[in-house]
Swiss-Prot record:
The gene is RAB28. The keyword Nucleotide-binding does not apply. This is Late embryogenesis abundant protein 31. The keyword Nucleus applies. One of its GO terms (cellular component) is cytosol. Induction: Stimulated in embryos by the transcriptional activator ABI3. Not induced in vegetative tissues by abscisic acid (ABA), osmotic stress or dehydration. Pfam families: SMP. A motif (Nuclear localization signal (NLS)) lies at residues 6-10. It is found in: Nucleus, Nucleolus; Nucleus; Cytoplasm. InterPro entries: LEA_SMP (IPR042971), LEA_SMP_dom (IPR007011). Keywords: Cytoplasm, Nucleus, Repeat.
Amino acid sequence: MSQEEQPKRPQEPVTYGDVFEVSGELADKPIAPEDANMMQAAETRVFGHTQKGGAAAVMQSAATANKRGGFVHPGDTTDLAAERGVTVAQTDVPGARVTTEFVGGQVVGQYVEPRPVATAAAMEAEVVGLSLQSAITIGEALEATVQTAGNKPVDQSDAAAIQAAEVRACGTNVIAPGGIAASAQSAANHNATIDRDEDKIKLIDVLAGATGKLAADKAVTRQDAEGVVSAELRNNPNLSTHPGGVAASITAAARLNERADI
């Protein structure tokens, strides 16, 4: 075999930023073998097996490539993974179970499993303390977002969705000073100037106790959900909503209210 035909080692390692939507220091870290092993173990604990095409599979492929390239060695672990953990968490939301995978505190994978209406109704009562005879309100749906996306840094799409929700809850286009919409916009503006996700204001900081922060509240309807989804989409450069985010929670609440006919 001539020198030109010799297989070449990759010039650079496969990093987290190459295969996942992560930011900050983690994005530049090569994926290490023990990181992949920890994710495989975490997926197996939750699902009973590793997910086909899931984070563990992606990480294993990347770690193997990095070992072949000589960038990492068997037994190596990324410092952020070792310090902050590799975890898989499950959260029940109206009509679905959301499974989220984390490395070093950042999301690297998410799966949404639809759930039957009866199960969803019972779950909603447990999560937000609702009577099954009462409709889910906008404030309660916003609070449910804390369960599914509380650690997400607030961006302009979140702020727009929260503003749309507050407008519909209060029945006025006037944004109340110090309300959740104003707080969300302030958080989004602040976060746009910050590089590290760890230093950014999160949804939990804005939406915790949302019901008590609204001047008024109302049961979520399909029209409310459509307005919130539209606002989040218009302000997202990718024209998508965030899994488990504000629009998703409002939509799930509206769907449950319709199915329960309350």
